Amino acid sequence: MAGTIEALVPGGQATPGPPLGPELGPTPVDVQDVVAQINDETAAFDGMEVPVTVEYDDDGSFTIEVGVPPTAELIKDEAGFETGSGEPQVDFVADMSIEQVKKVAEQKSTDLLAYDVKNAAKEVGGTCASLGVTIEGEDARTFDDRVDAGDYDDVLDE
């Protein structure tokens, strides 16, 4: 490969403008073709920020690798809000069910350090706490303790 470009683009809505256009402009690839393929491959993440890597050759050929959106983006999409809280320990913006937390954990499982769904859910819980999202009506900062106590084994062990 002659070069690699990494960018965070809105799923299904990439354009030839920034951040892709200025990076791809001086390369031998057709910018419109790259943008079209990125939009096709990221359509399932419509509106979410998605990491993409474009590798290209001197002959104009290219390959695109689409990553999983950041955990915060998946949480925002699942819980239905646009921005986190300015005071996440005081002002809560949304509440998620344990099933929703599990869904996000499973979506992110390839990018997380956790070795099972329970620990992946605990990582998601940490992000919920920083965004001002409660889990099952409780402060997300206590989620780890509740998982360790087995409160959610019926859902997380499935």
From Swiss-Prot:
GO cellular component term of the entry, any: large ribosomal subunit
SMART domains per the UniProt record, alphabetical: RL11
InterPro entries: Ribosomal_uL11, Ribosomal_uL11_C, Ribosomal_uL11_C_sf, Ribosomal_uL11_CS, Ribosomal_uL11_N, Ribosomal_uL11_N_sf
Keywords in alphabetical order: Ribonucleoprotein, Ribosomal protein, RNA-binding, rRNA-binding
Taxonomic superkingdom: Archaea
Ribonucleoprotein is among the record's keywords: yes
Protein biosynthesis among keywords: no
Region span, Disordered: 1-28
Annotated GO MF terms: large ribosomal subunit rRNA binding; structural constituent of ribosome
PANTHER family named among the record's database cross-references: 60S RIBOSOMAL PROTEIN L12, LARGE RIBOSOMAL SUBUNIT PROTEIN UL11M
Subunit structure as annotated in this protein's UniProt entry: Part of the ribosomal stalk of the 50S ribosomal subunit. Interacts with L10 and the large rRNA to form the base of the stalk. L10 forms an elongated spine to which L12 dimers bind in a sequential fashion forming a multimeric L10(L12)X complex.
Full protein name: Large ribosomal subunit protein uL11
Native organism: Halorubrum lacusprofundi (strain ATCC 49239 / DSM 5036 / JCM 8891 / ACAM 34)
